Amino acid sequence: GQLLKKHPAIAVLEPVNEPGYWWFEKWQEKNPNGTRDGFEKWSYENTRDYLNRMVKLFREEGAMQPVVWNCGWEGLIEKNRAAFRGIAASDVDAISFCLYPGQRDLKKPFWENPEELSHKNYLPYVQAVSEAEERLGWLRSEAFKDKAKLVYEFETFCNQSGYIYPAMAAFYREVGAQIATQWTYGLTGYAEYLGGSHVFNLKTTPKKAASFMVAKQQFKDVDTIYSFESRSSGVFHEGTLIYSGEIEMTVPSRPQSIIGVGHSAFVNYGGTGLYFIEPCENGALHLTLMPDTQFIRPHWKELHTGEPVVRLDDEAQHDFELKLPALGKRWIYRREGPRWVPVTASEGAVRFAAQPGEYLIEQEKLMIDRKLLEEGWGH
């Protein structure tokens, strides 16, 4: 087998997820005559020395990846300042943190008291967390300036809105984060049955998925747009337009690719699933319409009963309109199994009754034998 320290896919080493720290009263149980000052000194030195021994062990074992220490969530520094000073003074290469807008709004334990939080505006919260030193503002402090920063869990909380991911990504970049790992993605085979504080999948949560794509560009320091009022976000970069819902934004040139949900200046579509419009050979466009999606049980509740939480509809039919400039005459084909079946032809804007699936929007009528169109390739 392959040793983890030599595995090319392991970029960094974070040995402990969300570690706990000693507090004064707990320390006093073993040090009954100990003072607060004594505890602070011990916490600083014990944390620093423990981390230094850990880094030394990794290096002696030949592991060359950066060593990351997990600093948890907002506000953790308040009761652990001496330990955090020890982290800053240690030999670890990087620190990691997370942010869950809305988690503090729920009664404890949150998994027994979930609520729908999509309707709440968390942009002021993200700003406040960023500015307050005792929350996550310490990430900008002089003590941690030489430590690389990572987000060990990038996710919302009981929230299906399409605006918050890019705002979080902007904050992460402001404090110097170089890596942000998503938590947690529901595998498509089970996504229809998944409920809880973290529900995220390309098919079942289209607005959230599109917003995460926008956030990816924000994390690369590309300007994006987002607002609570629209519950949406968008970005136009290098010819690709992405939006998680209807939002006013300036698009300075004709998009080459479009990923979106709902209506925009270039697409009218009443379906609730994501769509992808991508260029392909001979000036054609490839259109993918994802299934319509609807929550039929509360997505924010921990539902592991085997009953569906989301309904996906592959048969729903909606008018689709593509309004890119200078489209001219176009022929539309739909994939049916191995076949491309003619749907309609249009002049100017492309309009047709569509249902989830794949389409080709061709500049020229496909010169394929009718038998091939009907029977498919290979028959």
Located regions from the model:
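Aromatic-lined carbohydrate-recognition surfaces of secreted/lumenal glycan-active proteins
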Residues: A9-N17, W42-A82, V92-L99, D146-E153, ...
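Generic structural signal for well-ordered alpha-helices
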Residues: G1-Q2, R48-K56, E133-G137, Y165, ...
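Short, acidic/polar
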Residues: G1-Q2, G75-A88, S161-A169
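Glycoside hydrolase catalytic-domain groove-lining segments
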Residues: V67, E78-C158
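Substrate-binding cleft of secreted/luminal carbohydrate-active enzymes
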Residues: C158-F236
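Alpha-helical structural signal in soluble globular domains
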Residues: Q2-L3, R53, L57-E61, G86, ...
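C-terminal beta-sandwich/jelly-roll accessory domains of carbohydrate-active enzymes
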Residues: R254-H379
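Active-site groove signature of glycoside hydrolases
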Residues: G1-K41, V151
